From Swiss-Prot:
Belongs to the DXR family. HAMAP family: DXP_reductoisom (MF_00183). GO terms for biological process: isopentenyl diphosphate biosynthetic process, methylerythritol 4-phosphate pathway involved in terpenoid biosynthetic process. Catalyzes the NADPH-dependent rearrangement and reduction of 1-deoxy-D-xylulose-5-phosphate (DXP) to 2-C-methyl-D-erythritol 4-phosphate (MEP). Disulfide bonds: none annotated. 1-deoxy-D-xylulose 5-phosphate binds at residues 126, 152-153, 187, 210, 223, 228-229, 232. It is an enzyme of class 1 (oxidoreductase). It comes from the Bacteria. It holds the Pfam family DXP_redisom_C. This is 1-deoxy-D-xylulose 5-phosphate reductoisomerase. InterPro entries: DXP_reductoisomerase, DXP_reductoisomerase_C, DXP_reductoisomerase_N, DXPR_C, DXPR_C_sf, NAD(P)-bd_dom_sf. The gene is dxr.
Amino acid sequence: MKTLTILGSTGSIGTSTLAVVRANPGAFRVVALVAGKNVDVMLQQCREFSPRYVCMANEGAAAALRQRLFECGLGTIAVMSGEHAACELAALDEVDQVMAAIVGAAGLLPTLAAIRANKRVLLANKEALVTCGRLFMEALSHSQAQLLPIDSEHNAIFQSLPTAVQQQLGFACLREHGVTRIVLTGSGGPLRQLPLADFDAVTPTQACAHPNWSMGRKISVDSATMMNKGLEYIEARWLFNASAEEMEVIIHPQSVIHSMVRYRDGSVIAQLGNPDMCTPIAHAMAYPDRVPSGVAPLDFCRMGSLSFEAPDMARYPCLQLAIEAFAEGQAATTALNAANEIAVAAFLDGRLRFTDIARLNRRVVEQLRCAEPDCVEAVLVIDSAARQLAQTLSARFSR
């Protein structure tokens, strides 16, 4: 039985992880749960999964949870709070693997703690590689930790790679193992066929109407701009030690093929499945074995045809910007990620037009010139500066 700490247990990935645990009670045991301020959901999780330890973001939430656990007869569960406690729970001796699903910068140090403690790290936190790719891969090289990707695209690529590359993830030479290209697929989002002339008038409702996946508003907008694919491109470069020439991004509107790997003999290996995050989560949790995920099997006879097209960078300037930012370095990708969060929030609030998202992102990356970060603290300084600049510049865009 594998033992587990879940960082971000009350979020989407965290609850899906617990769904896989629920479906496989003899395979996994939850030792620790870490979350933000959602006491109600954490209480429900404690009742069902009986962790030994729980950590909330602040002492106020922790105190409220302690009281409610005591009232339920679960007062033996140790309730902690704060980032330091989250790092401790990520590095527990009794834990085999850590689901790193805390969103944003708050997840960086706990994920790094898990790597330094030689855990199997199931990586769902985008910021870990988008903002700290070099730092995380250096930490991985000095530890015996194993990284397994949770993003559906990166997990699909992982499954399609040779075992030797899987076992040296981030360090193996793709060419030496017969791999010529990694093919990152994306649906193209809900605006794929909208005339470019109509982009200025796109509303948040339009941008959030994803055709295949059920997602939050921020990531739905990122899908519409294909910034999500740009961030996944950055992650893939680090995860698979891939050069720009070894990367390919294509649009696949049906979201059935989650990504592919090309080999020198002309073979292409792909991973297919219904669009449900429980599939990659179950794969990573059980690797190298397989367990039921609870996801309905793919019905090929009802699936219909699959189509592909090249991304139009005039339609998706955020994708092009992410590719360029990776070539510039970690400071640029950190600035881009931070600026995009500000830009998307402003769009959702009605303060920016849809087309201003890419314009604002580019201005921040071009204007904010910083030295390459050599620690997480330096990354956070760049992140903060980029957010401040994006806020200032966004005021100059008028609807």
